[in-house]
Amino acid sequence: MSDSLRIIFAGTPDFAARHLDALLSSGHEVVGVFTQPDRPAGRGNKLTPSPVKVLAEQHNIPIFQPKSLRPAENQAMVQALDADVMVVVAYGLILPQPVLSMPRLGCINVHGSLLPLWRGAAPIQRALWAGDSETGVTIMQMDVGLDTGAMLHKISCPILPQDTSATLYDKLAELGPRGLLETLELLADGSAVAEAQNDALATYAEKLSKEEARLNWQLSAEQLERCIRAFNPWPVSYFTVDEQPVKVWKAEVITTAHSTLPGTILQADKQGIQVATAVGILNIQELQPAGKKVMSAQDLLNSRREWFVPGNTLD
């Protein structure tokens, strides 16, 4: 391989840890890891380290967990590591300009979309919900904007009709490390070419909210089915019936035309619970009532058939 690089890695969740793992298996030297402070998690609200911290500890890499990189003393932590490049993957903190300029080759970021599409916090989910036919990862040179830096490398993959955010996440978690290592090779031997983003083509992937997860029957069946896949595994689409929230994990589109009020139950049997939408019918196949496990429509009908009487409406 080309010359070994001294790398600072900054990341927090599992998606980031998979990239750190790839770096640790390469010929590069990870001289320090920045990750978010431990957070309360689980039933006992016990302080829990991030997946990136756990991996760094296993490899005895120096770990830094500042709450912010704005204070000069925290920026000095970065400077002292004398890195060639800083690799940032789902870190969760803003990098001020002084930090971006510290490593010899600057800071690069792995982003889960084909930039300039879906800049922002939830690119995987937004691409799926929008009905895009493909997505991918972009490795970019970071600047102070929100995912606006020049692009160094892209890898794309198709979005399949059955993909959920969970399955796309796994695909991109495989593509990202590969693209990262290829980009580092180009940076190390001086052959990387940076391509400016076309801001006119930019779209924004706002963070998901639980409020968005409520199924809006005024949308088409196609839109709702994509919403269900985009919000799997979090926050999970839902409707309410008898004032009870019911999560929806799987559904299919029936293109049959109808003139029924959206949200009306048309049919409920072992094939699913068919609900009228603005365009077409949504056939709900897997559901989860509050406090229960995920179950088939048939299993839920066995215990709660009164919830799904044809002619009734869902909220």
Swiss-Prot record:
CDD domains found in the cross-reference section: FMT_core_Met-tRNA-FMT_N (cd08646), Met_tRNA_FMT_C (cd08704)
Catalytic reaction(s) noted: L-methionyl-tRNA(fMet) + (6R)-10-formyltetrahydrofolate = N-formyl-L-methionyl-tRNA(fMet) + (6S)-5,6,7,8-tetrahydrofolate + H(+)
GO cellular component: cytosol
SUPFAM superfamilies assigned: FMT C-terminal domain-like, Formyltransferase
PROSITE patterns, alphabetized: GART
Annotated positions binding (6S)-5,6,7,8-tetrahydrofolate: 113-116
PANTHER family named among the record's database cross-references: METHIONYL-TRNA FORMYLTRANSFERASE, METHIONYL-TRNA FORMYLTRANSFERASE, MITOCHONDRIAL
Official protein name in the record: Methionyl-tRNA formyltransferase
Species assigned in the record: Pectobacterium carotovorum subsp. carotovorum (strain PC1)
